[in-house]
């Protein structure tokens, strides 16, 4: 076999076709964002993988055979093992002024949880210790209680990050995974945080509230969102994310029959390939977030692993608005407004369609006032001012006001979709009267809305794992309609332009999903420097208060030397 190095294109595996560094931002914000975002070299970089590196990667045996596996469906006994119950069995360190980083209490719980799975026989022996980076994984022993103090002495920052990212890879089914639901209990999220005038705050009983929280409510609006989220992901994948012409191998190996490329199997369906599991804050282990869509490569084990030339991570929070759902065959204000929008394809008709319901998805507020907290999308552009405006004397704190100013100059892309082609079974975006496929409108994300806070927390958590990458979050708003009788039971493939052919046959609108009408893609700008430290400090403070409440002052401390992180 030729011993010369095997090379492959160093071009990143994913590129955003239409989200360039300066778009869709406008005004002064465009210049600032453009200056912050690093651009890739126009020349194609070349990387190489030496045979000796391949041998080292395979030295421990067949790497695919040792891929970590954690089940999504759990026995009833396992589902009752919560972080809070595990933490209540811990003990304070000898010197109360020296505390462990809470991440080690979280990982100690996860190790024992996976250990119980070993005892149940639903995962391989040694999985618990292998998850936490043990060089010689050993089987879990019944009755074991892992002390956070011990982990803090043996785990490096790299092994902590690896363990947290491995958990993310095993929980990508999100709400369909019992493991995802169990690990979220006892984690702080954007919804369990309180947001005061100066930023994030914690409820005194935040851990108890999170642990005892009921499951996701089963109402029509949420059902609509869960059903159509994958359609929105496919639309984003088709309209914004393009695979590079030369695919990037996750690992190049020689299994004995010649060199070959090995790719992450989960990436075979692009929309689902970008789905994320539960990400825990690598800084503290207190905060958790689950992203709807993250444009990032994964290694052969399914773990997030940005390509070496990828400097920007784009992620999307998807919201499907059920309140616009209508039957196109019935005469109604929404159906009429939609017919006019599809006929004329103007910004005026777009505004009329959005206002065809009682509470439009875009709220107008005067530039001298502040928006409410009801709608996730807002505008203060005079062309969007309705005939009747209720004047209010709303107030908001500095935290929200600063973020309103930061997002004020941002604009949204709006995509309008043609009626499905029943013969070719495709759906394509329609051109607006301007000739554009994506109409830029002066609509931005509302910092007072829970969706904005959710994205802010997601960005904070993600930044802890990839601190050297520029983050670009977007809020995606999907609006769809009921199917006509002739459309029922059909799966439609998405084209990225009217005259184009399907770019990827896996980017589809499934038969159970609504027919897409509109897609808003809105950039979200957060004050990274002002937020990250606040969230981290508040998280540590909240955890320490919870620990103090649990640990009685007379409880016997561990006899070992205290460890601080």
UniProtKB/Swiss-Prot annotation:
GO cellular component: host cell cytoplasm; host cell nucleus
Pfam families, per the entry: Viral_alk_exo (PF01771)
Keyword set, alphabetical order: Endonuclease, Exonuclease, Host cytoplasm, Host nucleus, Host-virus interaction, Hydrolase, Nuclease
Keyword Hydrolase: yes
UniProt-listed Enzyme Commission number(s): 3.1.-.-
First-tier enzyme category under EC: hydrolase
InterPro entries attached to this UniProt entry: Herpes_alk_exo (IPR001616), PDDEXK-like_dom_sf (IPR011604), Restrct_endonuc-II-like (IPR011335), Viral_alk_exo (IPR034720)
Site (Required for function): 229, 292, 317, 319
GO molecular function annotations of the record: DNA binding; endonuclease activity; exonuclease activity
Gene3D superfamilies: 3.90.320.10
Keyword Nuclease among record annotations: yes
Major location (coarse): host cell
Compartments, record wording: Host nucleus; Host cytoplasm
Protein purpose: Plays a role in processing non linear or branched viral DNA intermediates in order to promote the production of mature packaged unit-length linear progeny viral DNA molecules. Exhibits endonuclease and exonuclease activities and accepts both double-stranded and single-stranded DNA as substrate. Exonuclease digestion of DNA is in the 5'-> 3' direction and the products are 5'-monophosphate nucleosides. Additionally, forms a recombinase with the major DNA-binding protein, which displays strand exchange activity.
HAMAP family linked: HSV_AN
Subunit record text: Interacts with major DNA-binding protein; this interaction increases the nuclease processivity of the alkaline exonuclease.
Family named by the database record: Belongs to the herpesviridae alkaline nuclease family.
The protein, known as: Alkaline nuclease
């Amino acid at each position: 076999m030729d011993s010369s190095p095997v090379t492959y294109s160093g071009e990143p595996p994913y590129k955003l076709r239409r989200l360039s560094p300066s778009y869709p931002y406008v005004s002064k914000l465009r210049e600032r964002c453009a200056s912050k975002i690093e651009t890739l070299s126009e020349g194609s970089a070349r990387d190489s993988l030496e045979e000796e590196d391949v041998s080292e990667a395979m030295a421990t045996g067949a790497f695919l055979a040792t891929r970590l596996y954690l089940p999504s469906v759990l026995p009833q006994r396992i589902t009752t093992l919560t972080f809070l119950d595990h933490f209540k069995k811990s003990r304070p360190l000898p010197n109360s002024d020296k505390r462990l980083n809470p991440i080690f209490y979280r990982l100690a719980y996860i190790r024992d949880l996976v250990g119980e799975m070993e005892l149940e026989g639903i995962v391989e022996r040694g999985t618990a210790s292998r998850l936490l980076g043990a060089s010689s994984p050993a089987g879990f022993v019944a009755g074991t209680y892992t002390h956070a103090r011990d982990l803090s002495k043996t785990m490096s920052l790299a092994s902590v990050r690896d363990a947290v990212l491995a958990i993310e890879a095993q929980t990508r089914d999100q709400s369909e995974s019992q493991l995802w639901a169990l690990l979220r209990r006892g984690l702080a999220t954007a919804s369990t945080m309180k947001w005061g005038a100066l930023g994030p705050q914690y409820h005194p009983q935040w851990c108890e509230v999170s642990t005892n929280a009921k499951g996701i409510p089963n109402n029509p609006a949420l059902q609509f969102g869960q059903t159509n989220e994958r359609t929105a992901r496919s639309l984003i994948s088709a309209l914004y994310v393009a695979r590079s012409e030369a695919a990037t191998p996750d690992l190049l190996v020689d299994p004995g029959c010649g060199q070959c490329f090995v790719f992450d199997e989960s990436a075979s369906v692009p929309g689902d390939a970008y789905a994320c599991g539960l990400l825990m804050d690598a800084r503290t282990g207190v905060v958790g977030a689950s992203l709807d869509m993250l444009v990032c490569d994964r290694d052969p084990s399914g773990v997030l692993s940005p390509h070496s030339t990828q400097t920007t991570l784009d992620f999307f929070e998807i919201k499907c608005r059920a309140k616009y759902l209508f039957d196109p065959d019935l005469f109604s204000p929404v159906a009429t407004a939609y017919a006019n929008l599809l006929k004329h394809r103007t910004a005026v008709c777009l505004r009329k369609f959005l206002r065809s319901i009682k509470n439009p998805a875009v709220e107008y507020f005067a530039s001298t006032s502040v928006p409410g907290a009801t709608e996730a999308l807002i505008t203060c552009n005079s062309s969007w001012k309705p005939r009747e405006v209720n004047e209010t004397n709303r107030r908001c704190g500095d935290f929200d006001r600063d973020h309103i100013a930061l997002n004020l100059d941002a604009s949204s892309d709006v995509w309008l979709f043609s009626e499905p082609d029943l013969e070719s079974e495709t759906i394509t975006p329609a051109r607006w009267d301007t000739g554009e496929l994506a109409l830029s409108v002066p609509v931005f994300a509302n910092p007072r809305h829970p969706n904005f806070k959710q994205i802010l927390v997601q960005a904070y958590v993600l930044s802890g794992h990839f601190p050297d990458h520029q983050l670009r979050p977007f809020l995606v708003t999907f609006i769809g309609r009921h199917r006509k009788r002739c459309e029922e039971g059909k799966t439609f493939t998405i084209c990225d332009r009217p005259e184009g052919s399907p770019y990827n046959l896996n980017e589809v609108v499934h038969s159970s999903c609504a027919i897409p009408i509109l897609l808003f893609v809105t950039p979200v700008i957060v004050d990274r420097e002002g937020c990250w430290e606040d969230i981290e400090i508040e998280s540590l403070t909240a955890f320490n208060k919870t620990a103090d409440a649990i640990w009685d002052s007379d409880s016997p401390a561990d006899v070992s030397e205290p460890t601080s992180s």
